[in-house]
Design a protein with these regions (language model features):
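Internal alpha-helical scaffold of NAD(P)-dependent oxidoreductase catalytic cores
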Residues: 18-19, 41-47, 62-116, 121, ...
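A general structural signal for well-ordered alpha-helical segments in protein cores
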Residues: 9, 13, 35-36, 86, ...
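C-terminal active-site/capping subdomain that shapes the small-molecule cofactor and substrate pocket
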Residues: 155-191
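Rossmann-like NAD(P)(H) cofactor-binding subdomain of soluble oxidoreductases
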Residues: 1-64
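Intrinsically disordered, low-complexity segments enriched in polar/charged residues with Gly/Pro
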Residues: 27, 51-52, 86, 171-174
Length: 191
């Protein structure tokens, strides 16, 4: 499982290169896009899956992550083919209560989360506001402009990301995640 920030993926893989063998498979649940390109430097595409998780988490200290609330995991092997290894991984994650599914439409979810994160992470970091600081007409208009831009790029790449689903997620965050500091704001405030 790969959870590192995008900028640290290559270094993390280089740090474990001696452990990567002919049976190694990777599931990237990193935010953003393009992670399979870096993972392909270590293993063939058929041993890579990408996905998205909606489990809320926060790094408490080095090596300690806290998760609160509920979420799920959706992923799909990059070659578009189901495999015994990834099927077993999904089963194991479900047994652990992680609500996991293998989903051929996962690119839609990845781009929708990218749009959501681009809006909240970027705007909250630049304005140094928590999520509820954007719950006003000007903040919501700015969020919408970012969402529209990211979704237009998704659509240009042939991904049918849904403005309605992202809009509902944004509304839910504005209504229920008051005081939340998106990760980019956390990083900025941590120095």
């Amino acid at each position: 499982l790969v959870f590192t920030k995008s900028a640290h993926t290559r270094a993390a893989l280089q740090g474990i290169a001696h452990l990567i063998g002919p049976d190694t498979h990777f599931l990237s649940l990193q935010n953003g896009i393009g992670h399979a390109n870096v993972l392909r430097e270590m293993v063939p595409l058929e041993r890579i899956a990408v996905g998205v998780t909606t489990w809320p988490a926060r790094v408490m200290s080095p090596g300690e992550v806290s998760s609160m609330g509920q979420g799920g995991i959706r992923f799909m092997p990059c070659d578009g083919q189901r495999s015994a290894v990834f099927d077993l991984l999904a089963e194991d994650l479900n047994r652990a209560g992680m609500h996991c599914s293998i989903d051929p439409q996962v690119q839609e979810a990845i781009w929708e989360k990218l749009a959501f994160n681009a809006a909240f992470n970027g705007v909250c970091a630049v304005t140094r506001q928590t999520v509820d600081g954007l719950a006003n007409p000007q903040g919501e208009a700015l969020l919408q402009r970012v969402l529209d831009e990211v979704l237009s790029v998704a659509h240009a790449h042939g991904v049918a990301a849904s403005a309605e689903r992202v809009g509902a997620a944004v509304r839910d965050a504005l209504d229920h995640h008051r005081g939340h500091q998106p990760s980019m704001l956390q990083d900025l405030l941590a120095g």
